[in-house]
From Swiss-Prot:
APOE exists as multiple glycosylated and sialylated glycoforms within cells and in plasma. The extent of glycosylation and sialylation are tissue and context specific. This is Apolipoprotein E. Residues 277-289 are annotated as: Specificity for association with VLDL. Residues 79-254 are annotated as: 8 X 22 AA approximate tandem repeats. Sequence repeats lie at residues 79-100, 101-122, 123-144, 145-166, 167-188, 189-210, 211-232, 233-254. Homotetramer. May interact with ABCA1; functionally associated with ABCA1 in the biogenesis of HDLs. May interact with APP/A4 amyloid-beta peptide; the interaction is extremely stable in vitro but its physiological significance is unclear. May interact with MAPT. May interact with MAP2. In the cerebrospinal fluid, interacts with secreted SORL1. Interacts with PMEL; this allows the loading of PMEL luminal fragment on ILVs to induce fibril nucleation. Belongs to the apolipoprotein A1/A4/E family. One of its GO terms (molecular function) is low-density lipoprotein particle receptor binding.
Amino acid sequence: MKVLWVALVITLLAGCQAEVEPEPEPEVQLGREWPRWQGSQPWEQALGRFWDYLRWVQTLSDQVQEELLSTQVIQELTVLMDETMKEVKAYREELEGQLGPIAQETQARVSKELQAAQARLASDMEDVRSRVAQYRSEVQALMGQTTDELRGRLASHLRKLRKRLLRDAEDLQKRLVVYRAGALEGSERSVSAIRERLGPLVEQGRVRAATVGTLASQTLRERAEAWHQKLRGRMEEMGTQARDHLEEMREQLEEVRAKVEEQGSQMRLQAEAFQARLKSWFEPLVEDMQRQWAGLVEKVQLAMATGPTSAPIENN
């Protein structure tokens, strides 16, 4: 994997770091159509907005002249610069985070080269803003005089800056693409290497786990059987104790029933004896009352029988 990264870096350095000799600048044509900057990454889209705005500024139309005098162009260029560099930094940090699997010295070199490319792009954008600000100052100094020469010089400078900006942006773009591809491939290689190293260990662990699982299942089965036997013995013991308790309770109930019957018999005998005693108490009294009553009835009858015969004798 280290060899792969060395090859990628050498290829990139050969294609991107070579200094391009400046070619003679042709006569600037205001309003000339520029190639559009294209890209799908957020930083590329932000740079595309800066690129389009710079193309509009280079037209040096009447509206551009008015906004240059009011510093609006400089302010908008500053906002677009900050937005672009913010997106570039975020994307670079994301890419550096994906370079974990590569060697440390390679990662440091890649990070240093990306930061240098980012700094060149920022310098180009700063030069554009500085040149526009300088043009604004010069126009204000020549207020009321012709500014055609200044406009031509600004257009020429913007053309040079635009070409340098395009070159450095493409250089950064190529570096990011190459390093991202290398990071992805390095990650895949690292994952494959880790999988190859861990494969035997995983298989060994699986076999060991299966062996341990078998022994554990045997041990658990033996323990379960012993626990079952122990539980069954305990249940039988509890059943025997329960039967003994039931038999003991049945005997106690029989004793209680016998005692109740015995007490019932005794109470019945006592009641009969008490009844006989009452009878012996009241029978003489009843007989005596019957005799007295019979005597009284007899006296009354005798009195009634003698009453009619004695009355006529007294009248004579």
